[in-house]
């Protein structure tokens, strides 16, 4: 059973995913968490504190997803990495689509607040690429992150009725990382 703060932040992310940032209020989080009115404001006195905590929870969930997709550790080859990233994209646009919608809304509303998490992700990708011997790892890490973000945006918007193709996503990542 999650603790109360985790429960509230999961509810806050659901609210943002469903209603956008304008819908994120203490009362909306209380309702989404099915808790008494005023509960959220007891834990997070201001909207800024609520947003900051939601961003922290989002980053925590992202870390859990990455760990779940690569339980045996970092990939040993570019092909393994491409497959893992394709799996992540499918997860973030399928089972965890609400988390991605919340991420997009938070990113548009609070770009400076999500910047640090983005750079940690890209930095981790850069380290992984360098360990795999990929040349120009920094630029390629940015390219892969940009590609993944674009694919997720399209799968949640203009291509939401289509079936995502893990093999095609992995092939595109391999092309981005080819010598």
Explain the meaning of each model-derived region.
Residues 1-6, 178-179:
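Actinobacteria-biased recognition of intrinsically disordered, low-complexity terminal regions
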Residues 115, 119, 130-179:
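Hydrophobic/aromatic-rich alpha-helical bundle segments in the mid-to-C-terminal region
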Residues 7, 11, 15-53:
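Helix-turn-helix
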Residues 51-58, 114:
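Alpha-helical DNA-contacting segments of helix-turn-helix folds
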């Amino acid at each position: 059973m999650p603790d109360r703060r985790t429960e509230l932040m999961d509810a806050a992310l659901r609210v943002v995913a469903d209603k956008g940032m304008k819908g994120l209020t203490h009362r909306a989080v209380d309702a989404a968490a099915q808790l008494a009115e005023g509960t959220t404001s007891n834990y997070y006195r201001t909207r800024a504190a609520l947003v900051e905590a939601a961003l922290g929870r989002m980053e925590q969930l992202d870390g859990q997803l990455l760990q779940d997709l690569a339980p045996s550790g970092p990939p040993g080859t570019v092909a393994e990495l491409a497959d893992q990233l394709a799996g992540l994209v499918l997860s973030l646009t399928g089972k965890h689509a609400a988390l991605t919608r919340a991420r997009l809304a938070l990113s548009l509303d609070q770009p400076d607040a999500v910047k640090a998490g983005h750079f940690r992700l890209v930095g981790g990708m850069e380290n992984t690429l360098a360990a795999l011997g990929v040349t120009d790892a920094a630029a390629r890490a940015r390219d892969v992150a940009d590609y993944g973000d674009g694919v997720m945006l399209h799968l949640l918007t203009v291509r939401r009725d289509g079936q995502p193709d893990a093999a095609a996503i992995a092939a595109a990542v391999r092309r981005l990382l080819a010598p």
